[in-house]
């Protein structure tokens, strides 16, 4: 009889790991602490809740590493990607989802699987000794008891960084006499984003307000915690230089204002639900106090009467030093019955977290069945990400990382004709090589 595998955490990684195990006919108990114990950032008790953005980023599998990871996960039977595709909303070349529909779809699939049992309870601390195989996917908002247990097992201090959340506004509160629909360079449908224009004077006033606005205070023990560079609060970016945002998330390139002159800067809003009634401010994650957010963001042309469905916020993320404490199949070296998955391993992003959950589920299933399982090739997105988390990164300076082509072994610099391959052609070469390597690996795990 196959032993039950316990998965702790019903976020993206835990949900994906549980699905992969169940699809391999392994009995799974999925433990989710919400609603028994809540977190500072979650709004619901749904499985696979998207806490920050509703975007899974670029879906371009030829020229973007995260788009390639999407493709590989689809080919590997990912539940998260299947539900993202089922609940996607317009977002240009990105894969964005209706967050409620997505979460409900994941939860329904897991609850309806005959090999999965969902328990709403907190696993406080070290899992019981008679749990022979455990996947810990407690996420960036790991409870204090579990964080302390991990610290004790690894012999290391918990590492942490701050992550911020962007506000969401109702579409019908936006003034379309000033704002307009358009994607940069008319990608996607050509009108997947709402754009709010600012001239130079308005932009300068906005930047000054961001810098001087009242921020959330840190606890004493949080003050030395760094931010994740890929999700900086907008006011932190503003403090780095007056025009930092004008060359970053507020750059006006690829857009034409039908309501007036060419803007100096643009605030973009991306659809947040399937109904198209909610839009989030792209790149506007913030630690401003709620009253300040309403005041400052309503100074943006087109958002003067904005109704906020959710204001931004800040939460502290916890992760372990994967290269130091994990083996090559995501097991804790100190306790091999425990396998880690998701953002707690130090990968960063929804897609990356789900991908590590997928691999943890596959590794755990193979172990439960007494089979050896090959790791995905290093030339694939799955393999490159796994290698980063489990050993290729420098342990002394290990930090959360999104998937990128810099994690892959470099392809040949010249093609078969001896011509140097660079730019977009080089990115496509990464993707072609990954596809070729993934097929035989998928065949081995399906045998």
Swiss-Prot record:
Keyword list, A-Z: Cytoplasm, FAD, Flavoprotein, Methyltransferase, NAD, NADP, Transferase, tRNA processing
Principal EC category: transferase
Compartments in which it is found: Cytoplasm
The protein's name in its UniProt record: Methylenetetrahydrofolate--tRNA-(uracil-5-)-methyltransferase TrmFO
GO annotation terms (biological process): tRNA methylation; tRNA wobble uridine modification
Sites where the protein binds FAD: 9-14
Family annotation (NCBIfam families): gid_trmFO (TIGR00137), PRK05335.1 (NF003739)
Catalytic reaction(s) noted: uridine(54) in tRNA + (6R)-5,10-methylene-5,6,7,8-tetrahydrofolate + NADH + H(+) = 5-methyluridine(54) in tRNA + (6S)-5,6,7,8-tetrahydrofolate + NAD(+); uridine(54) in tRNA + (6R)-5,10-methylene-5,6,7,8-tetrahydrofolate + NADPH + H(+) = 5-methyluridine(54) in tRNA + (6S)-5,6,7,8-tetrahydrofolate + NADP(+)
Organism, scientific name: Paramagnetospirillum magneticum (strain ATCC 700264 / AMB-1) (Magnetospirillum magneticum)
Cofactor(s) required for function per UniProt: FAD
InterPro entries (alphabetical): FAD/NAD-bd_sf, MnmG-rel, MnmG-rel_CS, MnmG_N, TrmFO
